[in-house]
Amino acid sequence: MIADIKKDAQERMGKCVEATKNQMAKVRTGRAHPSLLDSIQVSYYGTMTPLNQVANVGIEDARTLSVTVFDRSAIQAVEKAIMSSDLGLNPMSAGATLRIPLPALTEERRKDFIKVVRAEAEGGRVAIRNVRRDAISEVKKLEKAKECTEDDVRRFEDEVQKFTDAHIKKVDEILAAKEIELMEV
């Protein structure tokens, strides 16, 4: 029973780390990366559709993304969706392909992005700690039901704390890498 709780907690903490990593990937750096456009929704035949379902996003060079739209009739909708996103991008149309030059980030904008990334990291840490709290409370319920001993609870708390620290360290490493990436000119 305790082993199941521990395994579940580890899986949930791993998912928290992945979710934090994915959220940080959406924060724009000076480099072109297809995941920058993942959050964009396009009005395609009256329904909001993710951009990656109506177009192929690729990297042309370090500061340019290319978006190849599958259906030529949707080019205007894709262009409008990219322009109206809060990313500050201006696509240039070239047939069925949109070229999106990424403007260089100002120092002020970089610092704003670092604040956003730090907030994401803190959110990840809090989520990991919440998983730890939930796991420990489940084991304490088992102790009250006389299904495990107080020593088992203490041992479990120590083990959970160790892998909580390990997962928080992973989040901190991801944060440090993202901060370095953001400060590169």
Swiss-Prot record:
SUPFAM superfamilies: Ribosome recycling factor, RRF. It is found in: Cytoplasm. It comes from the Bacteria. It holds the Pfam family RRF. GO terms for cellular component: cytosol. One of its GO terms (biological process) is cytoplasmic translational termination. One of its GO terms (molecular function) is ribosomal large subunit binding. CDD domains: RRF. InterPro entries: Ribosome_recyc_fac, Ribosome_recyc_fac_dom, RRF_sf. Transmembrane segments: none annotated. Keywords: Cytoplasm, Protein biosynthesis. This is Ribosome-recycling factor. Belongs to the RRF family. The keyword Protein biosynthesis applies. Responsible for the release of ribosomes from messenger RNA at the termination of protein biosynthesis. May increase the efficiency of translation by recycling ribosomes from one round of translation to another.
